[in-house]
Amino acid sequence: MSLIMRVLNGNLSLRLSAMKTVCQLQCGYSSHAKYAEHKSIERIRNIGISAHIDSGKTTLTERILFYTGRIAEMHEVRGKDNVGATMDSMELERQRGITIQSAATYTMWKDTNINIIDTPGHVDFTVEVERALRVLDGAVLVLCAVGGVQSQTLTVNRQMKRYNVPCLAFINKLDRLGSNPNRVLSQLRSKMNHNAAFIQLPIGVESHCKGLVDLVQERAVYFEGENGADLRLDEIPQEMRVESQERRQELIEHLSNADETFGELFLEEKPFTEADIKAALRRTCIKRTFTPVLVGTALKNKGVQPLLDAIIDYLPNPGEVENLAYIEHEGKEKQQIVLNPARDGKDPFMGLAFKLEAGRFGQLTYLRCYQGVLRKGDNIFNARTNKKVRIARLVRLHSNQMEDVNEVFAGDIFALFGVDCASGDTFTTNPKNNMAMESIFVPEPVVSMAIKPNNTKDRDNFSKAIARFTKEDPTFHFYFDNDVKETLVSGMGELHLEIYAQRMEREYGCPVTLGKPKVAFRETLVGPCEFDFLHKKQSGGSGQYARIIGLMEPLPPNQNTLLEFVDETVGTNVPKQFVPGVEKGYREMCERGMLSGHKLSGIRFRLQDGGHHIVDSSELAFMLAAHGAIKEVFQNGSWQILEPIMLVEVTAPEEFQGAVMGHLSKRHGIITGTEGTEGWFTVYAEVPLNDMFGYASELRSSTQGKGEFTMEYSRYSPCLPDVQDQIVRQYQESQGMGQAEKKKKKN
């Protein structure tokens, strides 16, 4: 009888909260605006929704906003009403059914303010995920119950690890044909090395998905009423009790291995209370030693409310995450300063700009406040440029809608207008403290395309679009190639550049034509090469004199996208004021290699000695000496071309396995693994990007349209000798070198 009463009370309280939600919807969102600014730090969560493409991130976010009363009705990503999901505010996102830009919002659940950033899943927009995770305290890693751990899931996992972001795993799409949450859990453990276990089990999968079993509270949860808003709590079904006991025991064992306090209880063989398990889940999740796994289907409105409870119960508040700033001292190591997350405003404001966007009222800069308080009318300083900015307007964001606020505190995510900055800049109210926060990791572009406006009259709009997009997106580069007289854009993939081309037409009325994709090769040294170069010029009056001696050598393979400059000079043969000139000359020459005209990378320049003239030496002379020294190394050194290698994942029916493997091998792919399940197989391979163009149409034709693939950048690696010869020959022909050699032979 007591169990039935508990269930009825649970139902009653949940239905009352649903009525409260309806009330909030009818009264506008005043409750969200009213309380969002004034919560204690324990009542705040900053989370991201991240996953591989098409795992259901945006649909899940839409359900979260609906159940928390933030929106009045739900819309589908590819819905028949053509409205699109709330967080996909860009017209292109709604048309293509994919998320292109990360979008921020905030909502309330059980008196807790949850700031949410919904991120793209496509590898071409990976920088959006990168900068979102940089400023978040926790994340929900969404996995498809059919696809499981896929290539972009692994990328997101690496990004979470880089920024030490705790996460919950949510296995979505239980309603899909072929869903297998047990297989996804085993992939979480084997492919991603997560100490993971279920805290929920599905009651049926595919079309039989009825609800879920809560292993912590040992009860069944059913989602009833319109849109699954009413939760009915019941006893665990008879046929699932054995499995539930086994999975609960597995959860307890995983927790006891990860948490010392819980492990002691386990060894003492004491019974565990619900509070014991919840406390251990929270401790281990925050320390990233355990990953709780939840289940559901956002599209069918099952599992979202328990996920919201788990976000509050297990993910950290801003006060439980250590955020650091650094003070640079010349000639010394950086000094680490732990920022104070208290929302009392006693310490100076510290914030990090993580995203720029051109809004209707000018440039919109997204920031996370890490310390102190910021109010309208305050002055803040950019730690990189030391420029002062007066705060005229503070806004909080709900997708593409803005809500003005008067102040923001530590832990808040907000936006400013009219701030000239770059992604990763630190802002503070006290410029004298010389503190800055760690910036955002930005991957190098791997694909280039020629671009030109279709009409010459659109050149002004074209320039405006390029200026805006290159500022917003640090992975989108633009430059003019003087040799071929072409304007080039480079980015993370073909889709990345196609999206920007379409945005130029839609947002600036400037249709453009894209050329064929070009791979961003690199050139590097094979072995060390010494140089001793004297630059001497006398043409009346003061001349130029500079001598530099040193060594250029390759960096380790894991650093082959970097350039290093090391000053090893002792004494005054090369005066210290001229060393920056040498470095500038070195970096300028690295913009264009000798073999293929691509950038140099993976090289360390060691300046060891030299000579100067008391009158004729200058920074310019030493810069030109560096130019000459590198030309000398071009002639005397041994060089090779590096190419981007992609991690490729192909899934197709088993009968096409031979054809798929054959095509990957033909494209110089190295198979790294295969797996099969229920008539389908997945093959993992490393393939040069240069060999992947046109693969989509080949895969479609060879698998009768049933195969699909994803790829993401892995690393740069040396080209095969015949590929290098071909690249060098093509470059020489484009420069007219081949023709000149033929003429010499004829003569």
Curated annotation (Swiss-Prot):
Pathway: Protein biosynthesis; polypeptide chain elongation. PROSITE patterns: G_TR_1, G_TR_2. The keyword Protein biosynthesis applies. GO terms for cellular component: mitochondrion; nucleus. It holds the Pfam family EFG_C. Residues 1-16 form a transit peptide. This is Elongation factor G, mitochondrial. Belongs to the TRAFAC class translation factor GTPase superfamily. Classic translation factor GTPase family. EF-G/EF-2 subfamily. GO terms for biological process: mitochondrial translational elongation. Keywords: Elongation factor, GTP-binding, Mitochondrion, Nucleotide-binding, Protein biosynthesis, Transit peptide.
